[in-house]
A protein has these predicted regions:
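Nucleic-acid endonuclease domains
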Residues: 1-461
Length: 461
């Protein structure tokens, strides 16, 4: 169905969009869509109809078809630091497993529909009625050259998985900025894929929430984000290849040698590893999470220290568990799922060539780096099993048993499934949180088993 109003230029559309800034969403709700509970697309539809005088559609081409302009309405939140972050990813068009692999990037459905976006940000406030959400900013979004090279690589990663018959194993952590998010009435919405008989979840191209947060801060707060790489570098090499190039001169060198080369004092301060890595990357003094490639792609870094056997001395720890959230959230909204589905890790791997017994003053050397995200098959099996088992134990009531000077519990431990488990991480036994059943327990974290970490990084020679 065509639009009721004809627009002759992108500037005319932008003028209309900007006229809504400072007004509330409800001022444009001419069809009372916001009174309909569960209408998730409601606010976008409200602005299509009430602001732009357009009929709601779900066509394959861009919304303003004659202008090649796609309208996207998305929520931002105000943080405690008084800046903004995206409330969620920006969902674009559905991935067609049967067709999309046939096209080049320039001819793809993704690029034809989304190369020019009109993005309208509204401010989400908890406990505020939808109709009272204020419209904050309207902006024309064209992918800047550096981002576009990474997005091309991301698109190709998704397409390559389809071609390999691996559409069922696509994960949002596979890519940097452009993700393939699940899309449907629920995560069980499935589709056929052309190169495998295994059904795959329906997915859509989307810009990650981390990418949208960085974009919102740039256009609203005018935050400038330093970048590691330039367009020319990204046209010929992947992000991983470029990272490997930066670390290559230091492979095989001891920590103290590297620190001397990059002029960083060796300390036992917790920030030492981060300072060392930022110096190696050529951005000394810059927090890694503030770099464009890290913030937009939600890349977190972890240092791993391997014993001479190739296995870390310790398991790898993550965040403290919110047990109340664990009980109440659905799997795909859970703390555990969100951490591993949406995050990519830069593992910086060091190795000792002596045991601690052989040399108390031993020093590790840099073995290598890798970008890693948890495979979808592990997320949906071992990780989900940890979530389900823990949820059941919490619902039944955790068994706390005095043992010597401490207290043991029946939460899944290191022998649970060889991949992930729960264990304490607290200052001492008095550092406790309340369980859903009212009992108190020493603060717990979720961990990845050290043997699993060893298996991940064993390809580094």
């Amino acid at each position: 169905m065509s639009t009721d109003k004809i627009y002759n230029s992108i500037e005319e559309v932008l003028d209309i969009a900007e006229s809504a800034e400072g007004k509330t969403v409800g001022e444009f709700d001419i069809n009372n869509r916001l009174d309909s509970r569960g209408n998730k697309g409601g606010i976008g539809q409200v602005l299509e109809e009430g602001l732009f005088k357009m009929a709601v559609n779900s066509r394959a081409e861009a919304d303003f078809v004659d202008l090649g302009l796609e309208l996207k309405v998305t929520a931002i939140k105000e943080n405690k630091k008084n800046d903004f972050s995206a409330k969620e990813r920006l969902v674009l068009n559905i991935i067609n497993y049967e067709e999309d692999y046939k096209d080049s990037f320039e001819e793809s459905s993704f690029w034809q529909k989304n190369k020019n976006l009109l993005i309208i940000f509204y401010l989400y406030k908890d406990k505020l009625d939808k109709k009272d959400f204020p419209i904050i900013k309207s902006v024309l979004h064209n992918f800047d050259p550096v981002d576009l090279e990474i997005i091309k690589q991301d698109w190709q990663t998704i397409i390559d998985k389809i071609k390999a018959g691996e559409a069922h194993n696509i994960s949002e952590g596979d890519t940097m900025y452009l993700a393939a998010c699940t899309k449907g009435a629920n995560a069980k919405s499935i589709r056929k894929q052309p190169f495998s008989n295994i059904p795959a979840k329906q997915r859509a191209f989307s810009l990650k929430s981390s990418y949208m947060s960085a974009f919102a801060r740039r256009v609203i707060d005018r935050q400038l984000i330093p970048s590691l790489f330039n367009v020319d570098e990204l046209k010929s090499k992947t992000t991983l290849q470029l990272l490997q190039e930066r670390f290559a001169p230091y492979i095989g060198k001891r920590v103290s040698e590297i620190a001397k080369l990059v002029d960083i004092p060796v300390t036992k301060n917790k920030a030492f590893n981060a300072n060392l890595i930022s110096a190696v990357l050529g951005v000394k003094g810059t927090k890694l999470e503030s770099l464009r490639e890290f913030s937009k792609a939600n890349i977190k870094f972890k240092t791993i220290r391997l014993e001479p056997t190739g296995i870390p001395k310790e398991h790898m720890s993550f965040e403290q568990i919110d047990f109340h959230r664990w009980v109440n959230d659905a799997w795909e909204d859970s703390q555990l799922y969100e951490k591993f589905e949406y995050t990519k890790y830069l593992f910086v791997v060091f190795q000792y060539d002596e045991t601690e017994k052989e040399n108390k003053n031993r020093e590790p050397y840099l073995k290598g780096i890798m970008l890693w995200n948890m495979p979808e098959v592990v997320i949906e099996h071992e990780l989900k099993a940890l979530w389900k088992t823990t949820k059941s134990i919490l619902e039944e009531g955790v068994q706390l048993t005095p043992v010597g000077n401490g207290v043991s519990n029946n939460l899944p431990g290191a022998s649970f499934n060889g991949i992930c488990h729960i264990r304490p991480k607290a200052r001492d036994g008095k550092d406790q949180v309340e369980l859903p059943d009212g009992q108190r327990i020493t603060k717990q974290c979720y961990w990845l088993n050290r043997e699993y970490i060893a298996d991940i990084v064993k390809k580094l020679k």
